[in-house]
Regions:
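Short beta-strand->loop
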Residues: 45-60
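Bilobed periplasmic-binding protein-like "clamshell/Venus-flytrap" ligand-binding domains
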Residues: 89-100, 179-184
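Long, aromatic- and glycine/proline-rich binding clefts that accommodate carbohydrate-like moieties
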Residues: 49, 98-150, 157, 182
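A bilobed periplasmic-binding-protein/Venus flytrap-type ligand-binding module shared by bacterial periplasmic
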Residues: 61-75
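Extracytoplasmic ligand-binding clamshell segments of periplasmic binding protein
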Residues: 1-41, 51, 78, 82, ...
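Short amphipathic alpha-helical coupling segments at ligand-binding clamshell hinges
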Residues: 74-87, 92-96, 168
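Short, well-structured alpha-helical segments that form the helix of a local strand-helix-strand
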Residues: 20, 165-177
């Protein structure tokens, strides 16, 4: 970097929270699922903000989806639905949000007394929820993991100066098209 305030290259996602808590990085862009851990372990004041904007706001979504597989037995499907209903109930969603930092999964979770009191005492807990007003669809396609890795690798290549952004993205686009050709 121009001012030598951070290591060259990119910072690994898996070590970012640790680096933040150890004061090795001043800002992190990470999952809301880290919020409670940061709150419990930071030995300094910190804030939470919406993602910056240029011409318009936007935020990715993603997270803990629930799936019921079609080949599951009827008994497994019923048990799965009981679990999903339990986990998404307002009280449980509120508890999960406070325990982890993830957002409550429904507006009703924010109406529970527990979560209302929590966000009153800890306003950063509603930043991600409020940012949903600007949410965009999650990148989801066939071979999502592989396509996302191509994009991540292109961004890293551009950030480290190995390729220009245009070169890196054109290369990723060609690779993604090759990967997805059989699905067209």
């Amino acid at each position: 970097s121009k001012h030598n305030v951070m290591p060259s290259g990119t910072i690994e996602w898996g070590t970012l929270r640790k680096n933040f808590l150890e004061g090795k990085t001043a800002i992190m862009w990470h999952s809301t699922g880290n919020l409670t851990t940061v709150k419990k372990n930071a030995k300094f004041d910190f804030g939470v903000a919406m993602l910056p904007e240029s011409k318009r706001r936007g935020t990715p979504t993603g997270g803990g989806n629930f799936y019921i597989f079609k080949q599951s037995s009827d008994e497994e499907k019923k048990a799965s639905m009981r679990l999903i209903k339990f986990m998404t109930s307002p009280e449980q969603a509120a508890h999960w949000s406070m325990a982890t930092g993830y957002m409550g999964v429904s507006p009703s979770s924010y109406q529970t007394e527990a979560l209302r009191n929590y966000v009153k005492d800890f306003p950063p807990a509603v930043v991600a929820r409020d940012q949903l007003n600007y949410a965009t669809a999650e990148l989801s396609t066939f071979q999502t993991g592989r396509v996302r890795k191509l994009l991540d690798d292109a961004i890293q290549s551009a950030l480290t100066g190995n390729e220009s952004p245009k070169q890196a993205l054109e290369k990723a686009q060609k690779s993604a098209e090759r990967l997805l050709r059989r699905y067209q």
